[in-house]
């Protein structure tokens, strides 16, 4: 009946939906009712989130010691280390496609322009087992809920999604993600809630060559103002991180107060990144 109601205007029943959802969360799960309860909970949550967008948590962990992996393009690892603050540079370790670092103040790193993303390492990797129940238990026992609360302000559950990067085929991957998400919800007492569209954090599960899984946390609650000049973009626009990488590679050849011409400027992303790296007298762009 919920599937049918989801196609109608059900706003008059939101209170009843919330009460029923609370009852389901308190219901003891058994092998017999687990599948039905999880499906009903997911449908109710999706229906409520369409009408009532959750209030997102505010990231406050800029000075909370954390172990991070800064994702970069291959070959940009050392250049990324070179632009880090001197007080943390020695602690950074280059790895393929990124830089690993344990830092007292993560906020010092969020402004690095050649970084494509920031992953938090909150549990011991790789995990010992790969079954969804074992992985969920490892994630929960590593203190994910407390880890998130320590770095955020705000009440309510944390909505997450799972990015599974393994050798499983598509239909197996979909089932694994669904079961892993439901198990994390159950273990956390629904302080973690799986949502494919309204998530504020992401669990990236990757498989190595030995078939072992590693889990990292990506926080979408961190405000990224590095490329705030980018008001409009088109499909052919250069990605700003790519532009920052190009400028970093050419840094030693850039002159102060130069006249700079980009004959294929597009939306001028490369010109702007060039100016931010070293001041130019004039910028010219044609396309």
Where are these regions (language model features)?
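SAM-dependent Rossmann-like transferase core, predominantly class I methyltransferases
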Residues: 215-253
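Short, surface-exposed recognition loops or helix-turn segments adjacent to catalytic cores
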Residues: 189-204, 260-264
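Alpha-helical repeat scaffolds
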Residues: 13-23
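C-terminal edge-of-domain segments
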Residues: 202-221
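Non-catalytic nucleic-acid substrate-recognition regions in nucleic-acid-modifying enzymes
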Residues: 49-196
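Eukaryotic acidic, Ser/Thr-rich intrinsically disordered low-complexity regions
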Residues: 29-56
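Structural detector for internal amphipathic alpha-helices that build alpha-solenoid repeat scaffolds
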Residues: 1-8, 39-43
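Conserved S-adenosyl-L-methionine
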Residues: 238-287
